[in-house]
UniProtKB/Swiss-Prot annotation:
Main location as per UniProt: secreted
One CC-aspect GO term: extracellular region
Protein name: S-layer protein A
Organism, as annotated: Sulfolobus acidocaldarius (strain ATCC 33909 / DSM 639 / JCM 8929 / NBRC 15157 / NCIMB 11770)
Annotated glycan sites: 60, 70, 276, 295, 342, 358, 377, 468, 517, 545, 559, 581, 633, 714, 875, 914, 955, 989, 1018, 1042, 1093, 1134, 1197, 1217, 1252, 1276, 1304, 1419
Length: 1424
């Protein structure tokens, strides 16, 4: 057969192939998804299933609009059109034993709508005890089938959302034939209520299927039917949810690409994969050890290659001379010669050779000499042959005779000795056959002798697996088996043997042909004598030759009865040459062939069947299946299961088909950003499904070769232990230092707790012949033979360019890199099992080049961690460096079938692309008034986490430093990434001046020699070129530099590019004042505490609040244009406040870099770091209007300061307290008593008092300054508020006028009550005593319309008021009820009067009250 076949030959797959006990089934492998308007059914099994016999019916309604308004109608319409056929069948014959078709009742059912998956669904409970009662089903469990339930609650038939769903009992459904609810006497319902008994006793299985009768809803058509669902059976592979066709869950996750749909109709499985199945076993409960038999076959005969492992013949059948040199097979076993003689010893000159064993026929003893022909003579065995059997004909039948060694306790293990010498040496062997001496000359060959045979044979193979499976929901057992287990696999086939004999009266000669082209000769067999000839053949394939063998030793007897009879008898013996034969591997039945002739001379021919059976070594079983053609795209596999506890064989078969897929390699899209920061890398995905070897621990497993039970046979198979690694890669690439991996003789596992958890067992581990190279720069997996000879080298080969790929250390064992596939995620039936994708993360960086770890310098290519490579290159080699990945499949089948097309090997190159770096000024023009012009270097490959710096040094060198860059524990290395080539200025007259890049010049030209990355990982760094420094170095002024061109040139080592930035230097206008506004300070005027004169006290000005701050507006359009996209600010550099008693100042000292504050006394109040004076902020980006204000405040205090009369120009003292302070960075700094700066303008006892202050302010834009004067004025503030007595009290009066308030309520004053009650408060805490001044006017002498008297008062009085500690809103005394004393008013005539009240600090003093200043009572009656 041609080895290379197509990826899928569907027509051949679907052929019915007889294997073992039943044909391959062609039913659905996996329940197909539900199409729009269709229906499907799923058996609810597995972990979390709440009961047995639950079937989920799903109708896809995605083709119509479903909303809250119509969901009830949609559910009822859909459910009313679902019909279910429930039946019972004989599991062996398929005959129907009962059937009923049911529908849902019009009410009383449980149905739901899933708004995410857009399906209507209903769960029916069919089996006891839930045939008549509902069972609750958690949404978390149902989400395995309907993932949308994880994110949204379903709606029930009433339209309400629910948190769980309930089943509809089978017994509540309506029999469509009667229109009535099915009765308990219904045979199907009766069977379902006793399903275990029915299955075990009557071989019954229960089957249900659904049909959606055709209907129209929302203008869309609905119809369809489900796959049959088997509820229970005696012991079968379930057809739901996984069907009898087994499948790998990775198939339905897109990993088969265009072949994904095969999972539903044609279950293809790649080699060495976990495949899923569900068994229904009503005989079992709890944990059951199952044995699975896998039968492999392909259509038609196969062409197989075999090689001669041994030639065994009686000495009379050997040529008199021939050349021979033993061939060493892949496992180290050597081919040998077997010479049968009657001599007790053979002689070779002076050398005497002892026999390896002997056998006896009819009393005559024959000696067997097993010899390897090599370079020396040895009396010590070089290898052994186990259980060599000779069949011989007798007069009536064929008899077997084992060849024994009487000197050995293991009498069937025959030693093989070596004879020989240098090439060309002739060995002459002498021995007898019967009584005739024979001499044979063997010349030692210069090349090994290997005889090959080719045969056309119809082959099949059988393998066994064992796994202990437990369940929480009998009778369903879900498990996983291996598609091609590493176990002893029996490969069998049928051929023929043909013989032609020439018979004479005294002797006969014959030729025997077997295995198509293997010919054995028998020369001159005398009558009544025996003659022997035979071969031992081994598979003629590099990886498995010498591991297993088939022995054919044929004995011939020439006899005379009534006819001349030439009889042949041959043994057919499977052998494992490196292992003792397994207990179940017995000699096959002998074959025989007889040639008869009534008279001689005569020539006769004959034919007889010949059997072939190889038992593979577990570690090479997969390779053997491939080499023999039994695993490939034409492979059909049937699987039977055996319940070892109940001794039951599955009634039906599971099945799957083989598939071999070539690998592919790809990268996720990437650009320069994949190579910048430490967490950036390129992901390379290698797709090689057939090579999945080592899944993650949660989905991996171990196999052990242990005795298994299958029917009445004891066989050996692979016992699967989930939870640990299957394969144990180790070893060193090459021909030496090979470590196969020691067998683990004892397993210790925890108790089984789930379907895939391990059990305790003891045995020997079989490792697949698949070991890993430990050189991470040339990471190979390779199939290596037992003697260390590599056969298939595969895996990932990596070549780094342009620098060599050296390891980070000189250690002899740097460790090897596992290519681990990803793990499948929930809701995969086997979460954690391997996917067919290997994800390899590749970092390429120059940033840690030259870093050291211990004593080792980091550079080149090395492994950072599992599945992660780092390629470290010099910065000058970074762009254009690449990693060339060559992936050779590690799967033998892929190599075998795709070798001729080369598809077994794929390539990918990951290269670092170039980028466009940029050196630029922010504007094509630069105002010369700026202190410096920004210069930006944008180089993406310089990008790194913050902070990252570039330092400029002598000659313009740029040193890159990124202290926070760490890649797998290795920090970045400071390195030179480029240099400034030149800085020049071309004047307006065309003259170009180049500035030498000396240390002094660099320090003058660059305000900061360190540029910081502006944003993490973006690679943009900001520098600044000093305009003043440029003027200094060129000895030019602003006018001379006007309209000149500044040029900077930089060379980048990483990209190899030379970058140039230019800007035109332009002289622009200075800043100018546009507007300014005065500040306002409020004072509270009162009188200094009583001084002994009741009618006079000195004025006391208490500073209370700054009600308005001084502000300025400047125009500086040129400054704004330096960065028109940003809102800029002008800085204040000096503020001097000049007042009545002196001046205070706040200024920035650019030399010291400090802000200095001095008060009105000339004292330094504070020295602050940096310029903390207020700034003027641009109103909008680029508009050039800047505005800002000074921030003054009043700091209250109790220190009363006397203001000299020389300052106030009065004849009396003036007092003040409260300090004027400036606010900087949120903190107030006192400049001195506010009254020493300014006082309100008031007239006090005929004298004018008052003064303003002036703030002299200097503003700078970094180039020029502007100074302006802004006044600060003072206002007198009167805090006392008066209000008439009212209930409830209203104080202060709401909405009262500032000056006068007339109260026209009736007031009566009697001689007994010469008082007037009012309420008094202060809007600021007022701690001093004050007077309520009362003036009384006759009503006829007061104009109430103007609020003014027309004559002098007829009475006045003063009433003292004081509250402790203070009067006022927010104090403990918010207001006072004051009785204004009017003693003596009764002396006035009775009549109508007007009383005017106001608050004064002392008698005759200024008014302290406001809102109103005067409280006027216009309706006062005085009685007598």
């Amino acid at each position: 057969m041609n080895k290379l076949v197509g990826l899928l030959v569907s027509s051949l797959f679907l052929a019915s192939i007889l294997i073992g006990i039943a044909p391959a089934i062609t039913t659905t492998a996996l329940t197909p998804p539900v199409s729009a308007g269709g229906i499907q059914a799923y058996l609810l099994t597995g972990s979390g299933a709440p009961a047995s016999g639950l079937v989920l019916f799903v109708v896809n309604v995605s083709n119509i609009q479903v909303s809250s308004s119509n969901v009830t109608n949609v559910i009822s319409t859909v459910v009313s059109n679902i019909q279910i056929n429930a039946k019972t069948e004989n599991a062996q014959t398929g005959a129907t034993t009962g059937s009923v078709t049911v529908r849902f009742p019009t009410s009383g059912y449980n149905a739901y709508y899933d708004s995410v998956d857009k399906v209507v669904f209903v769960v029916v409970s069919f089996l006891y005890p839930y045939t008549t009662t509902s069972v609750n089903i958690p949404l978390s469990y149902l989400s395995k089938y309907l993932p949308g339930l994880l994110t949204a609650q379903p709606y029930d038939e009433t339209g309400a959302q629910v948190t769980s769903v309930s089943s509809t009992p089978f017994g509540s459904l309506i029999d469509t034939s009667t229109g009535q609810q099915i009765l308990g006497t219904n045979p199907v319902l009766t069977s379902y209520n006793s399903y275990t008994t029915q299955a075990n006793t009557n071989m019954q299985e229960g089957v249900v299927s659904g049909t959606l009768t055709s209907f129209t809803l929302g203008g869309q058509s609905f119809s369809g039917s489900t796959v049959p669902v088997i509820l229970y059976a005696p012991f079968i592979f379930s057809n739901s949810p996984y069907q009898a066709g087994l499948y790998n869950p990775m198939q339905v996750n897109g990993n088969l690409g265009s072949l994904s749909s095969e999972a539903y109709y044609h279950p293809v499985i790649w080699g060495r994969a976990l495949i899923n199945t569900t068994l229904i076993d009503t005989y079992a409960s709890g944990s059951v050890p199952f044995t699975f038999q896998l039968n492999y076959s392909v259509p038609g005969p196969l062409t197989i290659n075999m090689a001669q492992l041994a030639w065994i013949a009686s000495i009379n059948n050997l040529p008199t001379s021939f050349t021979y040199l033993s061939y060493k097979f892949s496992n180290g076993y050597e081919s040998f010669l077997g010479i049968i003689s009657n001599s007790t010893q053979l002689t070779a000159g002076a050398l005497t050779i002892n026999p390896s064993g002997n056998f006896t026929i009819n009393g005559k003893k024959f000696y067997v000499y097993l010899l390897v022909v090599g370079s020396t003579n040895s009396t010590t065995p070089v290898e052994y042959v186990t259980k060599l059997v000779v069949e011989y004909p007798s007069s009536t039948n064929f008899l077997p005779q084992g060849v024994t060694v009487t000197t050995s306790s293991n009498k069937y293990t025959l030693p093989v000795y070596e004879i020989g010498g240098p090439a060309g040496t002739t060995i002459t062997l002498t021995g007898n056959w019967y009584s005739t001496p024979y001499t044979v000359q063997i010349t030692v060959g210069s090349t090994p002798t290997l005889t090959n045979y080719v045969s056309q044979i119809l082959l099949k193979a059988v393998a066994y697996e064992g796994i202990n499976v437990s369940t929480t929901q009998s009778p369903y057992y879900s498990t996983a088996i291996l598609s091609t287990p590493p176990s002893e696999i029996s490969i069998t086939g049928s051929s023929t043997i043909t013989a032609q004999g020439k018979l004479t009266a005294t002797s006969a000669s014959a030729t025997v042909n077997l295995l198509t082209n293997a010919t054995l000769t028998y020369e001159n067999i005398p009558l009544t004598q025996y003659s022997f000839n035979g071969i031992i053949v081994t598979p003629g394939y590099a990886a498995i030759n010498g591991t297993t063998a088939m022995a054919y030793v044929i004995g011939a007897l020439y006899n005379k009865t009534s006819d001349y009879v030439l009889s042949f008898a041959g043994s057919q013996e499977p052998m494992q040459v490196m292992n003792n034969n397994l207990t179940e591997v017995t000699t096959l039945a002998p074959f025989g062939l007889t040639l008869l002739a009534p008279s001689v001379p005569a020539t006769e021919t004959g034919t007889s069947p010949l059997q072939l059976e190889f038992f593979t070594v577990p570690s090479t079983s997969y390779i053997a299946l491939v080499d023999f053609g039994l695993w490939g795209n034409l492979t059909s596999v049937t699987v039977s299961a055996y319940d070892t506890v109940n001794n039951k064989l599955s009634v039906n078969l599971g099945y799957f088909y083989g598939i071999v897929i070539p690998p592919s390699i790809s990268t996720a899209p990437y650009n320069y950003q994949n190579f910048i920061c430490p967490n950036n890398y390129v992901t390379v995905t290698i797709y090689d499904p057939d090579a999945v070897l080592d899944p993650y621990p949660s989905g991996s497993f171990t196999t052990s070769s242990l005795p298994l039970k299958y029917g009445n046979m004891n066989i050996t198979g692979a016992v699967i232990f989930p939870g640990s690694s299957v394969y144990n890669p180790s070893g060193v690439f090459g021909y030496s230092n090979f470590n196969k991996g020691a067998a683990v003789t004892t397993f210790t596992y925890t108790a089984q707790s789930g379907p895939f958890s391990p059990v305790a067992l003891t045995g020997n581990t079989n490792y697949l012949s698949q070991y890993a190279d430990n050189n991470p720069t040339d990471n190979y997996y390779f199939i290596q033979t037992v003697n260390g000879m590599p056969v298939l080298m595969g895996g990932l080969s990596i070549v780094a360019s342009p620098v060599s790929a050296s390891l980070p250390s000189s250690t002899s064992s740097p460790g090897f890199m596992y290519l681990l596939p990803s793990a499948a995620q929930v809701p995969s039936p086997l979460p954690g099992m391997a996917t067919p994708n290997y994800n390899l993360n590749i970092y390429i960086t120059y940033k840690i080049d030259g870093a050291t770890v211990g004593n080792n310098m980091i550079n080149g290519l090395y492994v950072a961690s599992q599945n992660t490579l780092i390629y470290v290159v010099p910065n000058g080699s970074f762009v254009g460096s690449n990693i060339k990945l060559t992936y050779t499949t590690t799967d033998y089948a892929v190599l075998h079938y795709f070798y001729s097309t080369g598809q077994y090997k794929v390539f990918k190159t990951v290269s670092v692309p170039n980028v466009t770096a940029n050196l630029y000024f922010p504007s094509s023009t630069t105002p010369l008034y700026q202190l410096s012009v920004p210069l930006y270097l944008s180089e993406p490959y310089y990008g790194s986490p913050l902070p990252t710096y570039i330092g400029l040094g002598t000659n313009g060198t740029s040193l890159w430093n990124s202290p926070n860059y760490v890649l797998f524990g290795v920090s970045a290395v400071q390195q030179y990434l480029g240099f400034i080539k030149s800085i020049s200025v071309t004047l307006s007259n065309g003259t170009t001046v180049v500035i030498p890049l000396t240390t002094s010049n660099m320090q003058t030209l660059f305000p900061q020699l360190v540029g910081q990355e502006l944003q993490a990982c973006n690679g943009t760094f900001q520098f600044g070129i000093s305009i003043t420094g440029l003027e200094k170095l060129l000895n030019l002024n602003v006018q001379q530099l006007n309209n000149s061109i500044l040029s900077v040139t930089y060379h980048d080592y990483v990209t190899g590019e030379t970058l140039t930035a230019t800007t035109k230097l332009v002289a622009l206008s200075t800043l100018s004042l546009v507007a300014k506004g005065a500040g306002v300070v409020e004072f509270l005027l009162t009188a200094y505490p009583y001084t002994g004169n009741i009618t006079f006290a000195p004025p006391w000005f208490i500073a209370e609040n700054v009600v308005k701050q001084p502000f300025m507006t400047y125009s500086d359009l040129q400054f704004a244009k330096t960065n028109p996209s940003a809102i800029l600010s002008l800085s204040t550099v000096n503020i001097t406040v000049v007042g009545l008693g002196g001046k205070a100042s706040v200024y920035y000292n650019s030399t010291s870099g400090q802000t200095v504050i001095t008060n009105i006394y000339g004292q330094t109040v504070a020295t602050l770091s940096g310029n903390v004076l207020p700034t003027l902020t641009e109103l909008a980006a680029g508009n050039g209007t800047f505005t800002g204000s000074l921030q003054f405040t009043i700091v209250p205090n109790n220190t009363v300061v006397q203001i000299p009369s020389s300052l106030t120009k009065t004849s009396f003292a003036v007092y003040t307290n409260g300090s004027l302070a400036i606010v900087l960075n949120g903190k107030a700094y006192s400049l001195g008593p506010a009254g020493l700066f300014l006082l309100p303008f008031v007239t006090y006892t005929g004298s004018a008092i008052g003064a303003n202050a002036t703030a002299i302010i200097t503003v700078s834009d970094g180039v020029g300054t502007s100074t302006t004067q802004v006044p600060i004025t003072a206002e007198n503030f009167t805090p006392i508020r008066l209000a008439p007595f009212q209930v409830p009290a209203q104080v202060p009066l709401p909405n009262a006028p500032k000056l006068k308030y007339e109260y026209n309520g009736s007031i009566v004053i009697t001689p007994q009550q010469q008082v007037l009650k009012i309420y008094v408060t202060s809007i600021l805490p007022y701690p001093q005593e004050f007077q309520i001044q009362a003036f009384v006017y006759e009503a006829s002498q007061f104009n109430v319309h103007t609020g003014s008297p027309t004559a002098a008062p007829v009475y006045f009085s003063y009433s003292a008021v004081r509250a402790y500690p203070a009067l006022g809103i927010g104090t403990s005394v918010p207001n006072l009820l004051v009785y204004v004393q009017l003693q003596g008013i009764s002396n006035l005539p009775a009549g109508k009067y007007v009383i005017v009240l106001s608050a004064v600090p002392f008698a005759g003093g200024p008014v302290l009250s406001e809102y109103p200043a005067q409280l006027i009572f216009t309706n006062v009656t005085l009685t007598q």
